[in-house]
Amino acid sequence: MTNRLKEKYVKEMTPALIEKFNYTSSMQVPKIEKIVLNMGVGDAVSNAKNLDKAVEELGLIAGQKPLITKAKKSIAGFRLREGMPIGAKVTLRGERMYDFLDKLVNVSLPRVRDFHGVSAKSFDGRGNYTLGVREQLIFPEIDYDKVDRVRGLDVVIVTTSNTDEEARELLTQFGMPFAK
């Protein structure tokens, strides 16, 4: 069974993007390469159990096991040593990536309080989009009663497009609700 968004991309979006940006080949059409979810857990320095809970929640959200990220440098002000675990990340590709994007756009983002669309300024200049989520409770897999504390996470959508304009059009066609 192929994913609904992937099917839409192949059948509807590719021809529309070729027409809009006058590509000569279908291989020039931008596509989503990967989605990276990152959760920095600053208080993991003092209490390692916080990191375990964050890893568990990120695993539920993404549907695959997160990688624990470690500190690159020691910072005395934060009581941080090089190599200490301070966060978790997940890289989604293929089917899981499309599943997550579908869930993010159609279920999770509409659950954000006072939601007026995501910022259109969060592109990096090379066609990648970054979105900060303030609380993990917007995802349907997270059970409100089992959450010990509210944590945010970063969602980075990496595309093959060369410009922000192309990436924005791609994400808009996928249904990303940009603020007007």
Swiss-Prot record:
GO cellular component: ribonucleoprotein complex; ribosome
Alphabetical list of Gene3D superfamilies matching this protein: 3.30.1440.10
GO aspect biological process, one term: translation
Leader peptide range in chain numbering: none
Keywords associated with the record: Ribonucleoprotein, Ribosomal protein, RNA-binding, rRNA-binding, tRNA-binding
MF GO annotations: rRNA binding; structural constituent of ribosome; tRNA binding
Top-rank taxon: Bacteria
Assembly with partners or alone: Part of the 50S ribosomal subunit; part of the 5S rRNA/L5/L18/L25 subcomplex. Contacts the 5S rRNA and the P site tRNA. Forms a bridge to the 30S subunit in the 70S ribosome.
Annotated family: Belongs to the universal ribosomal protein uL5 family.
Protein role: This is one of the proteins that bind and probably mediate the attachment of the 5S RNA into the large ribosomal subunit, where it forms part of the central protuberance. In the 70S ribosome it contacts protein S13 of the 30S subunit (bridge B1b), connecting the 2 subunits; this bridge is implicated in subunit movement. Contacts the P site tRNA; the 5S rRNA and some of its associated proteins might help stabilize positioning of ribosome-bound tRNAs.
Protein name, as recorded: Large ribosomal subunit protein uL5
UniProt organism field: Latilactobacillus sakei subsp. sakei (strain 23K) (Lactobacillus sakei subsp. sakei)
